[in-house]
Amino acid sequence: MDRDFGIFSFLAVSVSAAGFFFGGFQYSFLILLSLMAIEFISTTLKETIIHKLSFKKVFARLVKKLVTLALISVCHFFDQLLNTQGSIRDLAIMFYILYESVQIVVTASSLGIPVPQMLVDLLETLKNKFKRKP
């Protein structure tokens, strides 16, 4: 009984902390987490296939994912401070969803997997919308 209480307490604290740091688990955030996992796994498997896998590369990629989540958290904090109702966080999440999607397509292409032109065009259009204007 005590063990179950400890597990549920840990889960409750974890979900509360995630809500504080990331503003909850809306679909856009869950999509981002899923794409980050897919990109991490697919790139790691690609490096395994081409015999270029190293602990240093995997660790660096993991650190980048954690820093991305930290940036999402910072955006959420700014939303709270500026009372923008999540628009800064949502924009950042959309940017990183696009980034992770492009990385997955690049990985698939480098493995020789055909990528539908419609998907390439869609990602290119979205990428152009997120580019900075001079």
UniProtKB/Swiss-Prot annotation:
Cellular-component GO terms for this entry: plasma membrane
Annotated protein name in UniProt: Uncharacterized protein YtkC
NCBIfam families noted in UniProt: holin_tox_secr
Lineage: Bacteria, Bacillati, Bacillota, Bacilli, Bacillales
InterPro entries registered for this protein in UniProt: Phage_holin_4_1
Membrane topology value: Multi-pass membrane protein
Organism: Bacillus subtilis (strain 168)
Location(s) in or outside the cell: Cell membrane
Signal peptide: none
Pfam families reported in the protein's UniProt record: Phage_holin_4_1
Keywords: Cell membrane, Membrane, Transmembrane, Transmembrane helix
Protein's UniProt keywords contain Cytoplasm: no
TM helices/strands, residue ranges: 5-25, 30-50, 62-82
Keyword Chaperone among record annotations: no
Family named by the database record: Belongs to the bacteriophage holin family. Cp-1 holin subfamily.
